[in-house]
Design a protein with these regions (language model features):
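Active-site-adjacent C-terminal substructures of enzyme catalytic domains
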Residues: 18, 109-186
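Metal-coordinating catalytic core of metallo-dependent amide/deamination hydrolases
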Residues: 1-115, 127, 133-135
Length: 186
């Protein structure tokens, strides 16, 4: 995908950029991402952590089956994969810090996705992550605003009248001055 974007970019009418949404538990990807950042191949870098929701979905047969299907693994192999990834959770903070250093050195803007506490937002800000993408509650959005961070919410949230997850309503955040970017979505 990245190679195709780079190949086609000069021919495209729109200013096309590469936004990498990195799942923080994908620790094995760190060396490659660091190289891409160093090489100037990433234009925007986001930290995503969906591990808790992945683990919670294991107890929901429909969601679990959908995840297993997407991987192409057997149910047993999928369970082993999730367990192996979860046990490496203690490595995530250091990996995030190294990637933040690499992104800062490369001049790449960073986003944190689904910040769920003001403390989480402050921790990401301390690493140079100046964009809060879809903060999950008003307190966290307010922390982002008070810290001078950009705050992103999704336009589908506005159109639907609320978040598909049941979290923060973007229209409420906009009305309170707690949204600086409205994204069309991915």
């Amino acid at each position: 995908l990245l190679e195709n974007i780079e190949l086609l970019r000069p021919k495209l009418a729109a200013d096309t950029r590469f936004h990498l949404r990195h799942e923080t538990y994908n620790l094995d990807a760190e060396p490659e991402i660091t190289q891409w950042l160093s090489d100037g191949r990433i234009d925007l870098f986001a930290y995503n952590d969906h591990m808790d929701s992945t683990v919670a979905s294991l107890a929901k047969p429909l969601k679990r089956n959908r995840m297993v299907e997407r991987t192409g693994l057997t149910s047993e192999a999928f369970d082993q994969l999730v367990q192996r990834i979860v046990t490496r959770g203690h490595e995530v903070p250091a990996s995030n810090a190294r990637l933040a250093e690499a992104a800062c050195a490369a001049g790449v803007r960073m986003l944190s996705h689904d910040d769920n506490t003001p403390a989480m937002r402050r921790a990401f800000r301390a690493q140079g992550v100046g964009i809060s993408e879809f903060p999950v509650n008003e307190e966290t959005a307010r922390e982002a605003a008070e810290g001078g961070d950009f705050i992103v919410f999704g336009a589908p949230n506005v159109v639907r009248g609320g978040s598909h997850t049941g979290w923060t309503r973007a229209s409420d955040m906009i009305a309170k001055g707690l949204c600086s970017v409205l994204a069309s979505d991915y």
